[in-house]
Protein backbone atom coordinates (compact mmCIF):
# COMPACT_ATOMS: atom_id res chain seq x y z
CA UNK A 1 0.00 0.00 0.00
CA UNK A 2 1.27 3.48 -0.86
CA UNK A 3 1.70 6.22 1.74
CA UNK A 4 0.12 9.67 1.41
CA UNK A 5 1.15 13.09 2.71
CA UNK A 6 -1.63 15.65 3.11
CA UNK A 7 -0.40 19.15 2.25
CA UNK A 8 -2.50 22.23 2.99
CA UNK A 9 -2.02 25.99 3.03
CA UNK A 10 -4.34 27.84 5.41
CA UNK A 11 -5.17 31.26 6.80
CA UNK A 12 -7.96 32.00 9.30
CA UNK A 13 -9.75 28.71 8.66
CA UNK A 14 -10.88 27.99 12.24
CA UNK A 15 -14.50 27.54 11.11
CA UNK A 16 -13.80 24.74 8.63
CA UNK A 17 -10.37 23.20 9.31
CA UNK A 18 -11.51 20.47 11.71
CA UNK A 19 -14.31 19.52 9.33
CA UNK A 20 -11.75 18.93 6.59
CA UNK A 21 -9.12 17.16 8.70
CA UNK A 22 -11.66 14.82 10.27
CA UNK A 23 -12.45 13.54 6.77
CA UNK A 24 -8.82 12.90 5.89
CA UNK A 25 -7.08 11.86 9.10
CA UNK A 26 -7.84 8.14 8.61
CA UNK A 27 -6.71 8.19 4.98
CA UNK A 28 -3.36 9.95 5.05
CA UNK A 29 -0.11 8.97 6.76
CA UNK A 30 1.29 12.47 7.25
CA UNK A 31 -0.35 15.87 7.68
CA UNK A 32 1.54 19.04 6.70
CA UNK A 33 -0.15 22.38 7.32
CA UNK A 34 1.41 25.65 6.20
CA UNK A 35 -0.10 28.76 7.78
CA UNK A 36 0.24 32.04 5.89
CA UNK A 37 -0.68 34.43 8.69
CA UNK A 38 -3.72 33.31 10.69
CA UNK A 39 -4.97 35.58 13.46
CA UNK A 40 -7.67 33.20 14.73
CA UNK A 41 -7.48 29.67 16.21
CA UNK A 42 -6.35 27.98 13.00
CA UNK A 43 -2.87 27.06 14.25
CA UNK A 44 -4.03 25.58 17.60
CA UNK A 45 -6.64 23.54 15.73
CA UNK A 46 -4.03 22.31 13.23
CA UNK A 47 -1.71 21.23 16.05
CA UNK A 48 -4.40 18.86 17.37
CA UNK A 49 -3.90 16.81 14.19
CA UNK A 50 -0.17 17.15 13.45
CA UNK A 51 3.14 18.43 14.74
CA UNK A 52 4.05 19.51 11.21
CA UNK A 53 2.61 23.02 11.27
CA UNK A 54 4.78 25.61 9.53
CA UNK A 55 4.62 29.38 9.25
CA UNK A 56 5.12 30.87 5.81
CA UNK A 57 5.30 34.59 5.06
CA UNK A 58 2.57 35.37 2.54
CA UNK A 59 3.94 36.69 -0.77
CA UNK A 60 0.70 37.13 -2.75
CA UNK A 61 1.49 33.84 -4.46
CA UNK A 62 -0.44 30.64 -3.78
CA UNK A 63 2.03 28.57 -5.82
CA UNK A 64 4.97 29.54 -3.61
CA UNK A 65 3.03 28.55 -0.50
CA UNK A 66 1.94 25.22 -2.00
CA UNK A 67 5.48 24.48 -3.21
CA UNK A 68 6.74 25.11 0.32
CA UNK A 69 4.14 22.69 1.70
CA UNK A 70 5.04 20.05 -0.89
CA UNK A 71 8.73 20.41 0.02
CA UNK A 72 7.94 19.13 3.53
CA UNK A 73 6.28 15.91 2.34
CA UNK A 74 7.95 12.50 2.81
CA UNK A 75 5.37 9.95 1.62
CA UNK A 76 4.93 8.25 -1.75
CA UNK A 77 2.09 10.53 -2.82
CA UNK A 78 0.94 14.03 -1.90
CA UNK A 79 -2.73 14.93 -1.52
CA UNK A 80 -3.42 18.66 -1.87
CA UNK A 81 -6.52 19.92 -0.05
CA UNK A 82 -8.15 23.21 0.84
CA UNK A 83 -9.67 23.72 4.28
CA UNK A 84 -13.16 24.25 2.88
CA UNK A 85 -13.29 20.83 1.21
CA UNK A 86 -15.01 17.77 2.65
CA UNK A 87 -15.33 14.11 1.70
CA UNK A 88 -18.40 12.09 2.67
CA UNK A 89 -18.26 8.56 4.08
CA UNK A 90 -18.83 6.83 0.74
CA UNK A 91 -15.97 8.70 -0.90
CA UNK A 92 -13.70 8.19 2.10
CA UNK A 93 -14.09 4.45 1.49
CA UNK A 94 -13.37 4.93 -2.22
CA UNK A 95 -10.23 6.89 -1.31
CA UNK A 96 -9.07 4.11 1.04
CA UNK A 97 -9.64 1.53 -1.69
CA UNK A 98 -7.68 3.64 -4.17
CA UNK A 99 -4.82 3.91 -1.69
CA UNK A 100 -4.70 0.13 -1.22
CA UNK A 101 -4.71 -0.62 -4.95
CA UNK A 102 -2.87 2.31 -6.55
CA UNK A 103 -0.38 1.17 -9.17
CA UNK A 104 3.12 2.68 -8.80
CA UNK A 105 3.18 3.93 -12.40
CA UNK A 106 0.28 6.31 -11.69
CA UNK A 107 1.68 9.82 -11.22
CA UNK A 108 -1.48 11.93 -10.88
CA UNK A 109 -4.94 10.97 -9.68
CA UNK A 110 -7.79 13.24 -10.68
CA UNK A 111 -10.91 13.45 -8.55
CA UNK A 112 -14.35 14.91 -9.17
CA UNK A 113 -14.56 18.41 -7.71
CA UNK A 114 -18.12 19.26 -6.70
CA UNK A 115 -19.08 22.96 -6.46
CA UNK A 116 -22.87 22.64 -6.04
CA UNK A 117 -24.30 25.43 -3.94
CA UNK A 118 -20.97 27.11 -3.20
CA UNK A 119 -20.69 30.70 -2.05
CA UNK A 120 -18.42 31.61 -4.96
CA UNK A 121 -17.13 29.71 -7.97
CA UNK A 122 -16.02 30.51 -11.48
CA UNK A 123 -16.68 26.99 -12.71
CA UNK A 124 -19.11 26.78 -15.61
CA UNK A 125 -20.17 23.36 -14.36
CA UNK A 126 -21.08 22.04 -10.93
CA UNK A 127 -18.51 19.24 -11.22
CA UNK A 128 -15.17 18.80 -12.97
CA UNK A 129 -12.14 16.52 -12.76
CA UNK A 130 -9.16 18.06 -10.98
CA UNK A 131 -5.71 16.70 -10.18
CA UNK A 132 -5.62 16.10 -6.41
CA UNK A 133 -3.13 13.30 -5.68
CA UNK A 134 0.46 13.54 -6.94
CA UNK A 135 3.38 11.12 -6.92
CA UNK A 136 6.08 12.83 -4.85
CA UNK A 137 9.11 11.46 -6.71
CA UNK A 138 8.71 10.90 -10.41
CA UNK A 139 10.76 8.36 -12.35
CA UNK A 140 11.47 8.73 -16.06
CA UNK A 141 10.75 6.00 -18.61
CA UNK A 142 12.04 5.53 -22.13
CA UNK A 143 9.39 4.84 -24.77
CA UNK A 144 9.24 3.80 -28.45
CA UNK A 145 11.27 0.88 -29.89
CA UNK A 146 13.31 3.16 -32.16
CA UNK A 147 14.14 6.87 -32.00
CA UNK A 148 13.36 6.35 -28.37
CA UNK A 149 12.52 9.26 -26.12
CA UNK A 150 11.72 9.87 -22.48
CA UNK A 151 8.04 10.08 -21.67
CA UNK A 152 7.36 13.55 -20.30
CA UNK A 153 3.57 13.43 -20.03
CA UNK A 154 2.42 12.19 -16.61
CA UNK A 155 0.42 8.99 -16.22
CA UNK A 156 -2.98 10.22 -15.05
CA UNK A 157 -5.79 8.18 -13.53
CA UNK A 158 -9.33 9.62 -13.47
CA UNK A 159 -11.00 8.33 -10.32
CA UNK A 160 -14.67 8.50 -9.32
CA UNK A 161 -13.87 9.96 -5.88
CA UNK A 162 -15.90 13.12 -5.23
CA UNK A 163 -14.42 16.03 -3.27
CA UNK A 164 -17.04 18.51 -2.07
CA UNK A 165 -16.05 22.19 -2.04
CA UNK A 166 -18.18 23.82 0.64
CA UNK A 167 -16.87 27.29 1.58
CA UNK A 168 -18.80 29.30 4.13
CA UNK A 169 -17.61 32.71 2.94
CA UNK A 170 -16.70 34.49 -0.28
CA UNK A 171 -12.96 34.77 -1.01
CA UNK A 172 -13.21 36.94 -4.10
CA UNK A 173 -11.78 40.10 -2.51
CA UNK A 174 -8.73 38.07 -1.49
CA UNK A 175 -8.49 36.71 -5.02
CA UNK A 176 -8.76 40.18 -6.56
CA UNK A 177 -5.92 41.39 -4.34
CA UNK A 178 -3.78 38.46 -5.51
CA UNK A 179 -4.52 39.06 -9.20
CA UNK A 180 -3.71 42.76 -8.76
CA UNK A 181 -0.52 42.12 -6.77
CA UNK A 182 0.65 39.60 -9.37
CA UNK A 183 0.25 42.15 -12.14
CA UNK A 184 1.90 44.87 -10.08
CA UNK A 185 4.96 42.65 -9.58
CA UNK A 186 5.27 41.13 -13.04
CA UNK A 187 3.25 43.38 -15.38
CA UNK A 188 1.97 40.15 -16.89
CA UNK A 189 -0.92 37.73 -16.47
CA UNK A 190 -0.79 34.42 -18.30
CA UNK A 191 -3.74 33.70 -20.62
CA UNK A 192 -5.16 31.17 -18.14
CA UNK A 193 -4.85 33.52 -15.15
CA UNK A 194 -6.24 36.43 -17.18
CA UNK A 195 -9.33 34.39 -18.05
CA UNK A 196 -9.81 33.36 -14.41
CA UNK A 197 -9.51 37.03 -13.38
CA UNK A 198 -12.13 38.07 -15.94
CA UNK A 199 -14.46 35.28 -14.80
CA UNK A 200 -14.23 36.31 -11.15
CA UNK A 201 -14.76 39.96 -12.07
CA UNK A 202 -17.84 39.16 -14.12
CA UNK A 203 -19.38 37.14 -11.31
CA UNK A 204 -18.36 39.18 -8.29
CA UNK A 205 -16.58 42.41 -9.20
CA UNK A 206 -17.99 45.64 -7.75
CA UNK A 207 -17.33 49.07 -9.26
CA UNK A 208 -14.02 49.54 -7.43
CA UNK A 209 -12.69 46.10 -8.44
CA UNK A 210 -13.82 46.70 -12.02
CA UNK A 211 -12.12 50.09 -12.09
CA UNK A 212 -8.83 48.56 -10.94
CA UNK A 213 -9.23 45.84 -13.55
CA UNK A 214 -9.91 48.41 -16.27
CA UNK A 215 -6.60 50.09 -15.41
CA UNK A 216 -4.80 46.74 -15.59
CA UNK A 217 -6.41 45.95 -18.95
CA UNK A 218 -5.40 49.38 -20.27
CA UNK A 219 -1.82 48.90 -19.08
CA UNK A 220 -1.62 45.34 -20.42
CA UNK A 221 -2.85 46.47 -23.83
CA UNK A 222 0.25 48.69 -24.12
CA UNK A 223 2.63 45.79 -23.42
CA UNK A 224 0.83 42.67 -24.65
CA UNK A 225 -0.87 41.76 -27.88
CA UNK A 226 -4.22 40.32 -26.84
CA UNK A 227 -5.63 37.33 -28.67
CA UNK A 228 -9.21 37.77 -29.91
CA UNK A 229 -10.43 35.54 -27.09
CA UNK A 230 -8.66 37.59 -24.39
CA UNK A 231 -9.78 40.86 -26.00
CA UNK A 232 -13.39 39.65 -26.00
CA UNK A 233 -13.14 38.77 -22.31
CA UNK A 234 -11.60 42.15 -21.52
CA UNK A 235 -14.27 43.98 -23.50
CA UNK A 236 -17.02 42.33 -21.46
CA UNK A 237 -15.42 43.55 -18.25
CA UNK A 238 -14.87 47.04 -19.65
CA UNK A 239 -18.50 47.18 -20.76
CA UNK A 240 -19.71 46.21 -17.31
CA UNK A 241 -17.39 48.74 -15.68
CA UNK A 242 -18.56 51.60 -17.90
CA UNK A 243 -22.23 50.65 -17.45
CA UNK A 244 -21.90 50.70 -13.66
CA UNK A 245 -19.90 53.94 -13.89
CA UNK A 246 -22.75 55.41 -16.01
CA UNK A 247 -20.42 56.16 -18.91
CA UNK A 248 -22.76 55.42 -21.81
CA UNK A 249 -20.46 56.22 -24.76
CA UNK A 250 -17.60 54.07 -23.43
CA UNK A 251 -20.06 51.29 -22.59
CA UNK A 252 -21.36 51.25 -26.17
CA UNK A 253 -17.80 51.35 -27.53
CA UNK A 254 -16.89 48.22 -25.53
CA UNK A 255 -20.14 46.48 -26.52
CA UNK A 256 -19.62 47.21 -30.22
CA UNK A 257 -16.06 45.88 -29.99
CA UNK A 258 -17.54 42.51 -28.98
CA UNK A 259 -19.74 42.47 -32.09
CA UNK A 260 -16.69 43.15 -34.27
CA UNK A 261 -14.49 40.57 -32.55
CA UNK A 262 -17.18 37.90 -32.69
CA UNK A 263 -18.12 38.67 -36.31
CA UNK A 264 -21.61 39.96 -35.59
CA UNK A 265 -22.73 37.22 -33.20
CA UNK A 266 -22.07 38.50 -29.68
CA UNK A 267 -21.73 36.49 -26.49
CA UNK A 268 -24.45 36.06 -23.88
CA UNK A 269 -22.64 38.26 -21.38
CA UNK A 270 -22.70 41.38 -23.58
CA UNK A 271 -26.36 40.76 -24.41
CA UNK A 272 -27.10 40.76 -20.68
CA UNK A 273 -25.09 43.96 -20.28
CA UNK A 274 -27.04 45.64 -23.08
CA UNK A 275 -30.29 44.43 -21.51
CA UNK A 276 -29.29 45.89 -18.15
CA UNK A 277 -28.28 49.15 -19.82
CA UNK A 278 -31.67 49.55 -21.49
CA UNK A 279 -33.50 48.40 -18.38
CA UNK A 280 -31.70 51.02 -16.31
CA UNK A 281 -32.66 53.64 -18.90
CA UNK A 282 -36.32 52.64 -18.77
CA UNK A 283 -36.51 51.01 -22.21
CA UNK A 284 -37.99 47.71 -21.05
CA UNK A 285 -39.02 46.33 -24.48
CA UNK A 286 -35.44 46.75 -25.73
CA UNK A 287 -34.12 45.20 -22.52
CA UNK A 288 -36.36 42.16 -22.99
CA UNK A 289 -35.13 41.77 -26.56
CA UNK A 290 -31.51 41.59 -25.39
CA UNK A 291 -32.35 39.15 -22.59
CA UNK A 292 -34.00 36.93 -25.20
CA UNK A 293 -30.88 37.21 -27.37
CA UNK A 294 -28.76 36.20 -24.37
CA UNK A 295 -30.96 33.18 -23.70
CA UNK A 296 -31.73 31.92 -27.19
CA UNK A 297 -29.31 33.33 -29.76
CA UNK A 298 -25.86 33.45 -28.19
CA UNK A 299 -23.32 31.47 -26.16
CA UNK A 300 -21.52 32.54 -22.95
CA UNK A 301 -17.73 32.80 -22.75
CA UNK A 302 -17.19 33.76 -19.09
CA UNK A 303 -20.28 32.69 -17.15
CA UNK A 304 -22.64 29.95 -18.27
CA UNK A 305 -25.41 31.54 -16.19
CA UNK A 306 -25.51 34.50 -18.57
CA UNK A 307 -26.88 32.22 -21.28
CA UNK A 308 -29.73 30.78 -19.26
CA UNK A 309 -30.31 31.49 -15.58
CA UNK A 310 -29.66 35.26 -15.60
CA UNK A 311 -31.83 36.15 -18.64
CA UNK A 312 -34.58 33.73 -17.63
CA UNK A 313 -34.89 35.34 -14.20
CA UNK A 314 -34.80 38.81 -15.75
CA UNK A 315 -37.56 37.97 -18.23
CA UNK A 316 -39.73 36.64 -15.42
CA UNK A 317 -39.07 39.83 -13.48
CA UNK A 318 -39.99 42.06 -16.41
CA UNK A 319 -43.09 40.06 -17.29
CA UNK A 320 -45.32 41.88 -19.80
CA UNK A 321 -43.43 45.17 -19.53
Residue ranges and their predicted role:
Residues 199, 240, 276, 317-320:
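Residue-level recognition of tetratricopeptide repeat
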Residues 78:
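Short aromatic/hydrophobic "clamp" motif used to bind/position activated sugar donors
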Amino acid sequence: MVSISLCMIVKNEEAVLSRCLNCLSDIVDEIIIVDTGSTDQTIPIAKRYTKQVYNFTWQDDFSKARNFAFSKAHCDYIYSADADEIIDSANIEKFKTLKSMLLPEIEIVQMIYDEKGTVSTVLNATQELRPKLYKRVRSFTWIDPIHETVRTDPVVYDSDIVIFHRPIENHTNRDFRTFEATYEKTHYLSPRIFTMYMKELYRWGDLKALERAANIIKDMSKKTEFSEARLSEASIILARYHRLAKNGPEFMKAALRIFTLMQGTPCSEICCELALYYEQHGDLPEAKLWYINAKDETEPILDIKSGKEIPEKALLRLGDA
